[in-house]
Amino acid sequence: MRKYEVIFILRPDLEEEKNAEVIEKFKNLIESHGGEIIKIDKWGKRRLAYEVKDFREGFYIVIQINAEPKLAAELDRVFKITDEVLRHMIVRENE
């Protein structure tokens, strides 16, 4: 297993319950594919460096996980088709 840092930005117009729903969706996806969640950080609403999909702010989430490379690819695929996610990035951390 490799260590990854998953960062994603949710739309700022979502309600708190919807944010929690989306986070839970990705948490369940990670665990169902054999990944291990180390830590979840909610940075809250922050200003974006530039406009993304007509939004100037976003709700930042950072998740540290241990996972196989196949899971990272699956997460990337699901992030791309999830409307609530403005941007995402998956980075492999050095051991």
UniProtKB/Swiss-Prot annotation:
Record protein name field: Small ribosomal subunit protein bS6
Q: Which GO terms describe its biological process?
A: translation
Superkingdom as given in the UniProt entry: Bacteria
Which gene is annotated as encoding this protein in its UniProt record? rpsF
Pfam families in UniProt: Ribosomal_S6
The UniProt entry's sequence similarity note says: Belongs to the bacterial ribosomal protein bS6 family.
User: NCBIfam families, alphabetically?
Assistant: S6 (TIGR00166)
List the record's Gene Ontology CC terms alphabetically.
Answer: cytoplasm; ribonucleoprotein complex; ribosome
**Which keywords belong to this entry?**
Ribonucleoprotein, Ribosomal protein, RNA-binding, rRNA-binding
Q: Membrane-spanning residues where?
A: none
Summary of the function given for this chain in its UniProt record: Binds together with bS18 to 16S ribosomal RNA.
Write one Gene Ontology MF term: small ribosomal subunit rRNA binding
